[in-house]
């Protein structure tokens, strides 16, 4: 739709201001008011003006302010639209002039005589052959859309190419972290073949109520404690194999391990979520259902780990990505009581940068893969915090002799 100031009135025969060959100007009623209002509207809507136009360059048809090069002429939007509609709808044979085709066309009179305006368009050499019919216009729009999509794809490719991949030192770091994970990850890639399902009758009959309304099945809890010590030991061994961790003071190492132990064990369980059996495989050997893990002592923490497992299944993480995620969790500089906070923070940044570059190298198809994966760090930190609170309830409700010494050593005295 043309701006109000540029719309011609097909039923109008008199000009706002019209000249005749041998007569003075005639004024149309209310012409001053209408011209003022239209001028105000034109001034209020400042369209895009191409850089190749000089300031206030006039339209060659009516003298109004030009907006660009249209149909081989410098014209305003009104004359461009008038010329296009005239050709597309073949209106010019029906145009007529009451004054023998002698009207002067300017920005005031342009809407009063269509014939003279069209003749002026032809006189200044506006090109009729450049006006597209409906089929050509649709084809042009389709071509514009195709080019726009191509540019988008080219930009994506360019962005992907611009994303840095690991350098030689980062590849070496990734190799060390991946090997540390593989050497301490029970059953490795063969966990599905070697897992054993916890009998369904275990963990389905909770007996001891806890203060928060959940219940603990002591038989299931006892089964879980059998695998907890080797699981914790493997996390400790993983940390000791990491570059930079052994350089930290012993006190800081202990704090970091206590803080991340549940988070890393939860991650290792979550990446072994099996949607077919709806189970997690703990410590690479015991497959459990959601209710069994919940009734066996973890309560709502069980839901969080299972939900994480379902989510991570879409990411298709490889060993290096799981290993780097564990390293990032381990090197969390916000653990309470640390002495070398700055050094630990720099260590984590080193792992994060190598991690991001490795993600660039892998070229996952999931949009915004890297920020989405980093959100899983937050989820795992929440699981660790919830487990610290849950541990207090388990201590109250379960016999002390069921707790392995290493389990108590790691999880007692944690901040809730």
From Swiss-Prot:
It comes from Salmo salar (Atlantic salmon). Zn(2+) 2 binds at residues 97, 103, 113, 116. Nuclear hormone receptor that can act as a repressor or activator of transcription. High affinity receptor for thyroid hormones, including triiodothyronine and thyroxine. GO terms for cellular component: RNA polymerase II transcription regulator complex. GO terms for biological process: cell differentiation; negative regulation of transcription by RNA polymerase II; positive regulation of transcription by RNA polymerase II; retinoic acid receptor signaling pathway; thyroid hormone receptor signaling pathway. Gene3D superfamilies: Erythroid Transcription Factor GATA-1, subunit A (3.30.50.10), Retinoid X Receptor (1.10.565.10). SMART domains: HOLI, ZnF_C4. Residues 1-58 are annotated as: Modulating. This is Thyroid hormone receptor alpha. Pfam families: Hormone_recep, zf-C4. The gene is thra1.
């Amino acid at each position: 739709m043309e701006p109000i100031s540029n719309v011609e009135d097909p039923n109008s025969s008199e000009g706002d201001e019209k000249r005749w060959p041998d007569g003075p100007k005639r004024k149309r009623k209310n012409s001053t008011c209408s011209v003022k209002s239209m001028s105000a509207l034109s001034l209020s809507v400042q369209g895009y003006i191409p850089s190749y136009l000089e300031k206030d360059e006039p339209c060659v048809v009516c003298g109004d302010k030009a907006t660009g090069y249209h149909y081989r002429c410098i014209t305003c939007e009104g004359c461009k639209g008038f010329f296009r509609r005239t050709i597309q709808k073949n209106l010019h044979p029906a145009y007529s002039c009451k004054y023998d085709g002698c009207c002067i066309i300017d920005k005031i009179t342009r809407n009063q005589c269509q014939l003279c305006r069209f003749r002026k368009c032809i006189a200044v050499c506006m090109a009729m052959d450049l006006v597209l019919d409906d089929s050509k216009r649709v084809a042009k729009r389709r071509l514009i859309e195709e080019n726009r999509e191509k540019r988008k794809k080219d930009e994506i490719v360019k962005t992907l190419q611009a994303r840095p991949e690991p350098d030689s030192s980062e590849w070496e770091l990734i190799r060390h972290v991946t090997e540390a994970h593989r050497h301490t990850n029970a059953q490795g890639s063969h966990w599905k073949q070697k897992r054993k399902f916890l009998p369904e009758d275990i963990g389905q009959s909770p007996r001891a109520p806890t203060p928060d309304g959940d219940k603990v099945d002591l038989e299931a809890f006892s089964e879980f404690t059998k695998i907890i010590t080797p699981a914790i030991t493997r996390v400790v061994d993983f940390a000791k194999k990491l570059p930079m961790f052994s350089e930290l003071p012993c006190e800081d190492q202990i704090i970091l391990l206590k803080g991340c132990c549940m988070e890393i064990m939860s991650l290792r369980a979550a990446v072994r979520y099996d949607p077919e059996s709806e189970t997690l495989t703990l410590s690479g050997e015991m497959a459990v259902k959601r209710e069994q893990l919940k009734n066996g002592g973890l309560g709502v923490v069980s839901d969080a780990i299972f939900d994480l497992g379902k989510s991570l299944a879409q990411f298709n993480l490889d060993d290096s990505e799981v290993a780097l995620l564990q390293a990032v969790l381990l090197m969390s500089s916000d653990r309470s009581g640390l002495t070398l906070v700055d050094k630990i923070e720099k260590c984590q940044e080193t792992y994060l940068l190598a991690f991001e570059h490795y993600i660039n190298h892998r070229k996952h198809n999931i949009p915004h893969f890297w920020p989405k994966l980093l959100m899983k760090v937050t989820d795992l930190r929440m699981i660790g915090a919830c487990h610290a609170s849950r541990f207090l309830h388990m201590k109250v409700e379960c016999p002390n002799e069921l707790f392995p010494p290493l389990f108590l050593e790691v999880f007692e005295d944690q901040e809730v």
